[in-house]
From Swiss-Prot:
Name used for this protein in its record: dTTP/UTP pyrophosphatase
A cellular component annotation (GO) from this entry: cytoplasm
PANTHER family in alphabetical order: BIFUNCTIONAL DTTP/UTP PYROPHOSPHATASE/METHYLTRANSFERASE PROTEIN-RELATED, BIFUNCTIONAL DTTP_UTP PYROPHOSPHATASE_METHYLTRANSFERASE PROTEIN-RELATED
Enzymatic reactions: dTTP + H2O = dTMP + diphosphate + H(+); UTP + H2O = UMP + diphosphate + H(+)
Active-site residues, record numbering mapped to chain: D87
Protein source organism: Ralstonia nicotianae (strain ATCC BAA-1114 / GMI1000)
Superkingdom classification of source: Bacteria
């Protein structure tokens, strides 16, 4: 008997985040990673523009990631399939909290969020196989318990804050800090599944 060929991926995922990969698998999406080359300047892509609001920022960066991924797919001569990108940012008041530069920066962010509510914004872009972009935005509110300096120091020592917007991951040890959330848990993790599934349906992707 001939072996059954593996089904084609539904889309390209232009993200190296293990959390986004896990969430896509959770809803049955088959994907192929479409990661950036070493010469692509991700830091320049994520720079905040003067006067930019957190909502505008996260949507602009997500759309730019999608444009870069589409160029990457074309340059590599890959088959035309939809592309999915996502970007998450945390904001406290009007301040955008990106990925911490170091332990001191992580401490500053966590201390600022202690006992307070902050917003987590995750933008999603799906570019269809014919190049049509579609966008969605998930906004959630998260309230932290009051954190002691010991709480913060232990969390930073775990290494978990680094590489994460707002210096924490809700799916990890920081779950113990979260007193209340309103919104999308998967969006806080990095990919809002309700909004993502709606975009995939618009792109005629059947899961």
């Amino acid at each position: 008997m001939e072996p059954t060929a593996a089904p084609h991926p539904h889309l390209y995922l232009a993200s190296q985040s293990p959390r986004r990969q896990e969430l896509l698998r959770q809803i049955g999406v088959r994907f192929e990673l479409l990661l950036a080359d070493g010469d692509e300047d991700a830091e320049a892509l994520e720079a905040v523009l003067l006067g930019e609001t957190p909502d505008d920022y996260v949507q602009r960066v997500c759309a730019l990631k999608a444009q870069a991924a589409a160029r990457r797919r074309a340059a590599r001569g890959l088959p035309a399939r939809p592309i999915l990108t996502s970007d998450t940012t945390v904001c406290l008041g009007g301040e955008i909290l990106g990925k911490p530069a170091d332990a001191a920066d992580a401490h500053r962010m966590l201390r600022g969020m202690s006992g307070r509510e902050h917003r987590v914004l995750t933008a999603v872009t799906v570019v269809t196989a014919d190049g049509t972009p579609m966008h969605a935005l998930s906004v959630s509110q998260v309230r932290f318990a009051v954190l002691t300096d010991v709480d913060i120091a232990r969390y930073i020592a775990s290494g978990e804050p680094f590489g994460k917007a707002g210096a924490y991951g809700i799916q990890g040890r920081a779950a113990a800090f979260v007193a209340h959330i309103s919104g999308s848990y998967s969006g806080i993790m990095g990919l809002p599944l309700f909004e993502t599934a709606a975009l995939l349906a618009q792109a005629a992707i059947t899961l």
